[in-house]
Structures are given as C-alpha cells and as structure tokens.
C-alpha cells in the first residue's frame, strides 16, 4: 500500500468491486433509519441522488448479528457480520460478498479497541494479512470530542474524511457525512463507516437485555 499522504491514490483501491471506484470525490450521508425490535437499519445517499442504499439488520434483539447492504435495486452486495461485541472493550466485524458469510466470499475484517475514552480505533485486515502477526492494512481513527473520523492506509494515506451531524457521540448521533476520495472503493468505505458507527454509539446488542431503553429515531 502507498505511503503517500495525498488525498487521492494513484491507483484505484478496490476491495468490494472495481465498479465502486470512481474518478471523482463523493460525499455520502449515512443516517440511522430505524432501531427497534424488528429492524436496525441505515440509509446511504450521495449528493447527486444517484445512490440510495439501505443497510439492514433484521430482528436485532433476537440473535441476528448481520447487516446486509442493499443497493438501489435491492440486491444484497455485502454482508457485515458482527462478533464479540463488548461495550468499551473489543469487538470485531467481517465483511463478505453478497448474502454470504462463507470463507470463500470473505472481503475484509476489522477489530475495535478502546484506548482513551474520547478516542476509538478500528484496525482493518484484508485476506492476505494475518492479524496475529501484528500487521494491518487500514485503520479508522475517530475522536469523540471533534465528532470526526479518518480512514487511512497503514502508510498514512488518507482515504476518507468524515464528520458526525445530528445529535452527539455519547448521547447517540443519528447521522454522519463521509467524503470518499477519488478512486477509492466507496462500498468498502460505507461498510467501514457503518461498522464504526455501530461499534461507537452502541449497537442493538447493548440493549438486548433492556429493550425498554431503545429509542427509535
């Protein structure tokens, strides 16, 4: 991976599919649509109105731990599986092609570790990288007080800048904006953003023993 810190990579970075790499910078708005007993979901739109995705976890309080990413036509392009969720501790996610969680369809994984209370880190791993050897391919670094986060390659190359709008970190932000650099797989970035959002503000698993505490937007 490149060590450059410029905002646009020289070569397209395709993780999910090359069709999601475009020559122009894209601004996305990701908002929490629903959070109740039957559905935990997000909407994803861009400034041009050409992209209108839904990311849905069905029956979040009844054992489902998978977000499914639906494109404009409703096709499932990716499944995001959560495991080992622990509040203010360590959790992990894995992304797969389509409606699958099979090893042959594995795309990437992330782990979250809480260091300081006001900072959250996600380390990401591609199939060719072994986490146990101490390497990682990309990371998400976020600061609660600034309401922002950055996705970087290991060498420091910035792939995306994002910031939260509507609400606050600790109280539960309802939406955020993501600016994806040109030639960067935006499906990959959207998946990372939802993983980050879910792990940071508290997912459905946080409330599994306290359903009366859930507040829907």
Where are the language model's segments positioned?
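Low-complexity or membrane-interfacial segments used for flexible interactions
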Residues: 1-65, 72-75, 90, 101-217
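Hydrophobic, ordered structural segments
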Residues: 77-79, 84-94
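Short edge-strand/loop segments of extracellular domains
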Residues: 96-100
């Amino acid at each position: 991976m490149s060590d450059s810190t410029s905002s646009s990579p020289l070569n397209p970075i395709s993780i999910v599919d090359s069709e999601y790499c475009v020559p122009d910078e894209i601004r996305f708005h990701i908002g929490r649509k629903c959070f109740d007993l039957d559905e935990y979901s997000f909407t994803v739109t861009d400034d041009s109105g050409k992209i209108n995705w839904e990311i849905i976890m069905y029956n979040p309080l009844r054992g489902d731990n998978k977000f499914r990413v639906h494109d404009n036509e409703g096709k499932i392009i990716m499944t995001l599986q959560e495991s080992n969720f622990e509040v203010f501790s360590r959790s992990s996610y894995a992304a797969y092609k389509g409606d699958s969680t099979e090893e042959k369809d594995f795309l990437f994984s992330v782990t979250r570790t809480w260091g300081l209370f006001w900072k959250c880190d996600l380390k990401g791993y591609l199939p060719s990288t072994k986490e146990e050897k101490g390497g990682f391919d990309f990371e998400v670094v976020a600061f609660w007080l600034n309401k922002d986060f950055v996705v970087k390659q290991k060498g420091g190359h910035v792939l995306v800048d994002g910031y939260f709008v509507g609400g606050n970190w600790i109280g539960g932000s309802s939406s955020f904006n993501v600016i994806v650099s040109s030639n960067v797989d935006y499906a990959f970035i959207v998946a990372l953003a939802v993983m980050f959002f879910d792990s940071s503000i508290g997912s459905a698993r946080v409330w599994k023993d306290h359903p009366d505490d859930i507040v829907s937007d």
